[in-house]
């Protein structure tokens, strides 16, 4: 092999070496780019999973809050319904009881207290009325006996109006039937006779 051939062979070998080195460098660069892209993709995947987890946690928290709120609403509605049922039952019972109280009061008022034979019976009726009244008062029943009070249509029902020189106009002169309220609500207005100015007199309230 002469020098020229050897030179050509060396050049060819050098060229192949350079090409091989360039190929290896390109492959290494490709591997580096691919690894970086995979890392970015993995990070994006993890971020997406984290966001999804956060959304699921928030959804679960919202569900818990809604369940608690609904439970509280159910509890409150139940309490209201129970209270309504209790008040309705108590109101109904009281309305049925009022005529009994009225009859006991009338029996005492009309009884001949001078009759010794009736004395023990009257005392028994008075004790019964007192016990019954004290019992129903514990449940919020209050009696209205508005003699001498100014007439109030919210609490009184005027059965008649009479002239009177002894009473201020619009004053309850007589109670025909006592009124009652239960826990602050009127269940029966008092039936009353109301005064008005006597004919020929001057109404100072006018």
Swiss-Prot record:
Transmembrane segments: none
Gene Ontology cellular-component terms listed: cytosol
GO biological process: protein folding
Principal cellular location given in the protein's record: cytoplasm
InterPro entries in alphabetical order: GrpE, GrpE_coiled_coil, GrpE_head
Region (Disordered): 1-21
Subcellular location: Cytoplasm
Role: Participates actively in the response to hyperosmotic and heat shock by preventing the aggregation of stress-denatured proteins, in association with DnaK and GrpE. It is the nucleotide exchange factor for DnaK and may function as a thermosensor. Unfolded proteins bind initially to DnaJ; upon interaction with the DnaJ-bound protein, DnaK hydrolyzes its bound ATP, resulting in the formation of a stable complex. GrpE releases ADP from DnaK; ATP binding to DnaK triggers the release of the substrate protein, thus completing the reaction cycle.
Protein name (database record): Protein GrpE
Organism name: Photobacterium profundum (strain SS9)
């Amino acid at each position: 092999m002469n020098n020229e051939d050897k030179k050509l062979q060396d050049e060819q070998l050098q060229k192949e070496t350079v090409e091989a080195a360039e190929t290896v460098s390109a492959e290494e660069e490709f591997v580096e780019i691919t690894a970086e892209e995979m890392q970015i993709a993995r990070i994006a995947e993890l971020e997406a999973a984290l966001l999804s987890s956060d959304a699921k946690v928030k959804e679960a928290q919202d569900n818990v809050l809604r369940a608690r709120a609904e439970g509280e609403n159910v509890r409150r509605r139940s309490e209201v319904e129970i209270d309504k049922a209790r008040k309705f039952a108590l109101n109904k019972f009281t309305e049925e009881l009022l005529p009994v109280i009225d009859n006991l009061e009338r029996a005492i008022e009309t009884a001949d207290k001078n009759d010794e034979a009736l004395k023990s019976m009257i005392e028994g009726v008075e004790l019964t009325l007192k016990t019954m009244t004290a019992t129903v008062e514990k449940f919020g029943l209050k009696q209205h006996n508005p003699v001498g009070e100014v007439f109030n249509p919210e609490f009184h029902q005027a059965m008649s109006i009479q002239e009177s020189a002894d009473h201020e106009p619009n004053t309850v002169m007589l109670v025909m039937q006592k009124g009652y309220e239960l826990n602050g609500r009127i269940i029966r207005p008092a039936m009353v006779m109301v005064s008005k100015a006597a004919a020929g007199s001057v109404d100072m309230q006018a």
